[in-house]
């Protein structure tokens, strides 16, 4: 949400206020003209991707109506947000696998770039720079962490995570003994993906009925400290990794619904992912396992 949206001033009686009450439909139509949005499965999206913090939307609405509503303000703000959710509802927001939505426009996988922005589910917080210098520090770090062929695999998988696709049908596991610096991968991914990445537990995906809904509209789910306990089942993980059709999602206290999942799993830990009962090829073929190098005893870590 831009700072512009956080400012409003009462100069004259707006069209949506008749002196006694607010016309909710007219208010929402005006609001959406100023700040275009659409909703998919009750989630708001702008040209900058998903609106993760609806409290900021409520603050903008509050700033507009606070001069005209003197009681029950919080309830009125919530009601207006719900009406707006219906007003801009769309059946589907297309997922494009031939482009990456970046902060300064759209980068197409054929190598072209456009500064134009369209409504999208995910926009990365980083800008495309065709003249960016070689990431020397990053490459040096990777050379200490992984073998050359594994570096290529890691970078290819990270690129795969930038588009909403599950065609790779793989998850990535980075395994080490500890202290190698593999958790830095998560820090870099957070900088690249921003709020389009969810951090949590892969095991929770199998044990919580609400975990799948938390992954809707996310590009990556990172588990930076995988549990060594074997998974009681693997159905959900396998289904999500290869998902091509809408899946049944459930939020607490709400009726389940069909939603698209294109999240990719990345796990960091001291051991591989295990299952109590699943010994099938289907479980293990979905995993790309990279083992880190032994930590150089002469390496001096930068605490900053």
How would you describe each model-predicted region?
Residues 2-5, 32-50, 55-56, 100-219, ...:
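P-loop NTPase catalytic core of nucleic-acid-dependent motor ATPases
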Residues 20-26, 190-194, 230-247:
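A short, contiguous, amphipathic alpha-helix enriched in charged residues
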Residues 199-207, 234-256, 301-304:
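Substrate-gripping "pore-loop 1 plus following alpha2 helix"
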Residues 210-217, 249-269:
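AAA+/SF3 P-loop NTPase mechanochemical coupling elements
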Residues 218-242, 257-263, 275-283:
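Conserved AAA+/SF3 P-loop NTPase catalytic/coupling segment centered on the Walker-B
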Residues 227-228, 270-275, 293-298:
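Conserved nucleotide-binding/hydrolysis micro-motifs of P-loop NTPases
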Residues 258-262, 279-304:
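Phosphate-sensing "switch" segment of ASCE/P-loop ATPases
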């Amino acid at each position: 949400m831009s700072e512009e949206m956080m400012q409003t001033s009462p100069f004259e009686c707006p069209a949506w206020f008749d002196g006694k009450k607010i016309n909710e439909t007219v208010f929402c139509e005006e609001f959406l003209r100023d700040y275009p949005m659409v909703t998919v499965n009750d989630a708001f999206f702008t040209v900058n991707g998903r609106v993760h913090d609806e409290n900021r939307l409520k603050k903008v609405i509050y700033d507009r109506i606070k001069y005209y509503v003197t009681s029950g303000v919080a309830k009125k703000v919530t009601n207006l947000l719900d009406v707006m959710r219906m007003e801009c509802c769309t059946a589907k927001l297309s997922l494009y696998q031939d482009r990456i939505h970046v902060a300064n426009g759209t980068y197409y996988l054929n190598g072209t770039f456009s500064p134009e922005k369209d409504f999208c589910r995910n926009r990365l917080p980083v800008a495309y720079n065709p003249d960016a210098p070689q990431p020397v520090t990053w490459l040096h770090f990777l050379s200490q962490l992984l073998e050359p062929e594994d570096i290529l695999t890691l970078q290819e998988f990270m690129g795969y995570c930038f588009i909403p696709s599950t065609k790779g049908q793989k998850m990535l596991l980075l395994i080490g003994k500890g202290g190698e610096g593999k958790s830095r991968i998560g820090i870099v991914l957070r900088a690249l993906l921003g709020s389009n990445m969810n951090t949590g537990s892969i095991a929770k995906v199998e044990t919580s009925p609400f975990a799948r809904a938390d992954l809707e509209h996310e590009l990556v789910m990172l588990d930076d400290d995988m549990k060594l306990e074997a998974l009681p089942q693997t159905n959900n993980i396998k289904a999500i990794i290869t998902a091509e059709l809408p899946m049944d999602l459930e939020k607490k206290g709400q009726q389940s619904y069909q939603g698209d999942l294109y999240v990719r799993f990345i796990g960091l830990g001291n051991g591989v992912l295990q299952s109590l009962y699943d010994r099938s090829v289907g479980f293990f073929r979905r995993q790309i396992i990279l083992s880190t190098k032994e930590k150089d005893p002469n390496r001096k870590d930068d605490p900053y």
